[in-house]
Curated annotation (Swiss-Prot):
<feature type="region of interest" description="Basic motif">
    <location>
        <begin position="29"/>
        <end position="60"/>
    </location>
</feature>
<dbReference type="GO" id="GO:0016604">
    <property type="term" value="C:nuclear body"/>
</dbReference>
<comment type="function">
    <text>Probable regulator of CREB1 transcriptional activity which is involved in adipose cells differentiation. May also play a regulatory role in the cell cycle.</text>
</comment>
<protein>
    <recommendedName>
        <fullName>cAMP-responsive element-binding protein-like 2</fullName>
    </recommendedName>
</protein>
<dbReference type="Pfam" id="PF07716">
    <property type="entry name" value="bZIP_2"/>
</dbReference>
<dbReference type="GO" id="GO:0033138">
    <property type="term" value="P:positive regulation of peptidyl-serine phosphorylation"/>
</dbReference>
<comment type="similarity">
    <text>Belongs to the bZIP family. ATF subfamily.</text>
</comment>
<dbReference type="InterPro" id="IPR039250">
    <property type="entry name" value="CREBL2/REPTOR-BP"/>
</dbReference>
<dbReference type="GO" id="GO:0046326">
    <property type="term" value="P:positive regulation of D-glucose import"/>
</dbReference>
<dbReference type="GO" id="GO:0005634">
    <property type="term" value="C:nucleus"/>
</dbReference>
<feature type="region of interest" description="Disordered">
    <location>
        <begin position="93"/>
        <end position="120"/>
    </location>
</feature>
<dbReference type="GO" id="GO:0030154">
    <property type="term" value="P:cell differentiation"/>
</dbReference>
<keyword id="KW-0805">Transcription regulation</keyword>
<dbReference type="GO" id="GO:0003700">
    <property type="term" value="F:DNA-binding transcription factor activity"/>
</dbReference>
<keyword id="KW-0597">Phosphoprotein</keyword>
<keyword id="KW-0945">Host-virus interaction</keyword>
<keyword id="KW-0238">DNA-binding</keyword>
Length: 120
């Protein structure tokens, strides 16, 4: 008897399931591999560029913080000697001016609300 089966009007012969190993186009496979390698190198290059930019920006931030720290150290040494650096004076007077402006604007607002409450 024949081992073939009839399914849906078609005769199927017994054998392995799935794809049959066809002739693989070696040139196409090689080209796909080369393309994949090119893309991988491009991704790697971009990743390294990003990391280098990140490192340089962090190094710039570190330098700026070191300069700021040195400035604060100098201010502290000057204050230990009884001198008040002009920068600190400017900061303090700037804060006092902004506080006085805030207080005056609060008084103005409070005066307006008092005037409104007395009007009835």
């Amino acid at each position: 008897m024949d081992d073939s089966k009839v399914v849906g009007g078609k005769v199927k012969k017994p054998g392995k399931r799935g794809r049959k190993p066809a002739k693989i186009d070696l040139k196409a496979k090689l080209e796909r591999s080369r393309q994949s390698a090119r893309e991988c190198r491009a991704r790697k290059k971009l990743r390294y560029q990003y990391l280098e930019e990140l490192v340089s920006s962090r190094e710039r931030a570190i330098c700026a913080l070191r300069e700021e720290l040195e400035m604060y150290k100098q201010w502290c040494m000057a204050m230990d000697q009884g001198k008040i650096p002009s920068e600190i004076k400017a900061l303090l007077t700037g804060e006092e001016q902004s506080k006085s402006q805030q207080n005056s604007s609060r008084h103005m607002k409070a005066g307006k609300t008092d005037a409104n409450s007395n009007s009835w």
